[in-house]
């Protein structure tokens, strides 16, 4: 989960308000109390949540020795890195060896570059700016800076009715768009892209904040390439929204709705990997076709193709593990 911090060591209440309203993850300040009276947010300060020099290090890269010192500090916690003339190569070297590097940046362009270095990017950016628009733009950029996932076409092999069971609707705190949804599966090795309820229907109004994700036992993709059981999710948890082009975004769960409904089983195959998912049997539940458009489960049949993801199977508390695990 990439983060956006703002450096307000030179205190500016108006900029602090902008940063808070933009949803930044933390603020660097000389006195945490200045921020705490405005809103609840992580502070990096001598009296803050994270203490400079103890919980967070700050390093200016000037040569190879300072790079090596930075990597040593990164073993202990986050490191805010400045590169003087803002050159890319030192950051590339650091990002290749640590996932705790935060880049000090002064513009949207610098932030974009830092977030995409070596494709994976830095862990976060620390904005050194007095421009409120830069804060707003970069904060929004970071929220949408999830890595792309490799979606593949699954050819359906089974679509059949089941009995009644408990299914989970994930109501998020975001408005999702057409072509967006969540990756959900019966196993941790393969997922279908389940479309959000953004489509107009004769019988019910759209619920663009909602994904009717499947039965309680299913896995859903969450930030950090982790998974969670649908039944274990709670308000305030983060889940990953995936678009038809593979782009991802982290969103907050506002509510879970678990209700008994008629279910159906959808199974498919991609490159020899089998995927399956138990979903509610209703017109408003949709997977995503290869064209990025929603396909209602009531219209699906064997031979149809939908988007999904193949993953490394085997999970322990949501983390991928290199272990022989058979799920079927």
Swiss-Prot record:
Keywords: Amino-acid biosynthesis, Aromatic amino acid biosynthesis, NAD, Oxidoreductase. One of its GO terms (molecular function) is NAD binding. InterPro entries: DHQ_synth. It catalyses: 2-amino-2,3,7-trideoxy-D-lyxo-hept-6-ulosonate + NAD(+) + H2O = 3-dehydroquinate + NH4(+) + NADH + H(+). Pfam families: DHQS (PF01959). Its EC number is 1.4.1.24. One of its GO terms (biological process) is aromatic amino acid family biosynthetic process. It is an enzyme of class 1 (oxidoreductase). Catalyzes the oxidative deamination and cyclization of 2-amino-3,7-dideoxy-D-threo-hept-6-ulosonic acid (ADH) to yield 3-dehydroquinate (DHQ), which is fed into the canonical shikimic pathway of aromatic amino acid biosynthesis. Belongs to the archaeal-type DHQ synthase family. NCBIfam families: PRK02290.1-5. This is 3-dehydroquinate synthase. It comes from Methanosphaerula palustris (strain ATCC BAA-1556 / DSM 19958 / E1-9c).
